[in-house]
Amino acid sequence: MNFNSLRKEIFSNNASVKELVNDIFTNIDHKDPEINSYICTTKDNAIAQAENIDKLIQFKEKLPPLAGMPIAIKDNICTKGVATTCASKMLKNFVAPYESTASSKLWSSGGICLGKTNLDEFAMGSSTETSLFGVTSNPWDINRVPGGSSGGSAASVAAGFCAAAIGSDTGGSIRQPASFCGVVGLKPTYGRVSRWGLVAFASSLDQIGPITNTVSDAAEILYSISGKDPFDSTCLDKPVPNYLTHLNKSIKGLKIGIIKECFEHPGLNPEVKESVLSGVDRFQALGAEIIEVECPRFNDGIATYYVIAPSEASANLARYDGVKYGYRSNDGSNLIDMTSKSRAEGFGDEVQRRILIGTYALSAGYSDAYYKKAQKVRTLIRKDFDNAFNKVDVLLTPTCPTTAFLKGDFVNDPLSMYLSDLLTVPANLAGLPAISIPCGFDTKGLPIGMQLIGNVLEEDRILNAANIFEIDAQVIKNRPSF
């Protein structure tokens, strides 16, 4: 299911928008219990939105750009009047009193909200196994994880439960599940899309972006949700190009940098390496110039990230104290006791682990050794990228070291789980745009993702390269059956 196929259905009078939306909900009702991609659906609201679009079509009114396109929203993004739980007991009953800027722009552009998708609690995870609402399954193999933290969004797109979904990416949470589920996942430049209404995890790293079946659909959504926002001081006041106009440009002469350190890492699965290198050969055949580059501190990104992100999380999550909103424990003889028990009962194990790591890294006597040093390494990682982009236009890596792993494989081994973000976190630390696209399958039939990283605000360039590759390679010929 993609935007072009849906538009053909609608404008050939084969089906009304309302009929298409009803069909999707029927599919969700029958099949999503096996996948568990949605936390909740918003059928009544979606039908009302669909009827409005049908009226515009009937009376030949001008249609907004995303008219009738069914979209799901990750459940850490606020949607007015609908529960925004972050898959946590802490926010299980929280109903957002306002709409996020990104989702508001989608609905203004004619998109239809199908519901809220599952995630790792507070977006802290790489498998969508830490959700209060249960584990999400990978549509390609329901015994495996879809990745995380935007696993529900990626799984819903791959399974055909929506045409597109919105996720958030702090260290790879859009791109990693996109790779595991065989779909397209785009993390924009930091500040390209407003974070207003995104529940904060690590504020200097978080970014909202699309998960779709095609690169062109990702380009459409990015165009709709980008732009300056007075509610977010970190949102960039820069012109937003129409990304669709750049998609089909020739990539002859495009300089693609292959990051040496990524392909030499001992944790890289041989099948993943082989598939991505085949993708490199395809780019070369399409006219791109392939250049090996070095980013000496690229592999230091994971250690740097797991100091900075938990540190910011420990500060951001301090607001959940059981007083103003969120879960409140009924036990406790005084305020301190009540707050302590509310947080202990309201947060899951992984969230508590990261809060403790962050609090330790920021504590007196340790912040110089850990947090400040991590910030210095972050600057060096960005300098490595700057040096690389002096030589090339786009950087290329595998998205993940492996394909989707079995449920439960790393539940008791968080360090191994963290390593699944090895190749994605550097782009977040540097604030750069990056996209994951399918490039092949392993011998188990599981999708493999390839990552393209661009310079600041050069989403048009990575979207162009990704689109040319997608059209030529035709990797995903059939969607998973389950």
From Swiss-Prot:
Pfam families membership: Amidase
GO BP terms in the entry: translation
Family annotation (Gene3D superfamilies): Amidase signature (AS) domain (3.90.1300.10)
Keyword Disulfide bond among record annotations: no
Top-rank taxon: Bacteria
UniProt-annotated catalytic positions: 74 (charge relay system), 149 (charge relay system), 173 (acyl-ester intermediate)
GO cellular component: glutamyl-tRNA(Gln) amidotransferase complex
Disulfide bonds: none
InterPro entries xref list: Amidase, Amidase_CS, Amidase_dom, AS_sf, GatA
Keywords, alphabetical: ATP-binding, Ligase, Nucleotide-binding, Protein biosynthesis
EC number: 6.3.5.7
Keyword Lipid biosynthesis included in the entry's annotation: no
Entry's Gene Ontology molecular function annotations: ATP binding; glutaminyl-tRNA synthase (glutamine-hydrolyzing) activity
Catalytic activity entry: L-glutamyl-tRNA(Gln) + L-glutamine + ATP + H2O = L-glutaminyl-tRNA(Gln) + L-glutamate + ADP + phosphate + H(+)
Subunit architecture: Heterotrimer of A, B and C subunits.
Purpose: Allows the formation of correctly charged Gln-tRNA(Gln) through the transamidation of misacylated Glu-tRNA(Gln) in organisms which lack glutaminyl-tRNA synthetase. The reaction takes place in the presence of glutamine and ATP through an activated gamma-phospho-Glu-tRNA(Gln).
Protein family (similarity comment): Belongs to the amidase family. GatA subfamily.
Descriptive protein name: Glutamyl-tRNA(Gln) amidotransferase subunit A
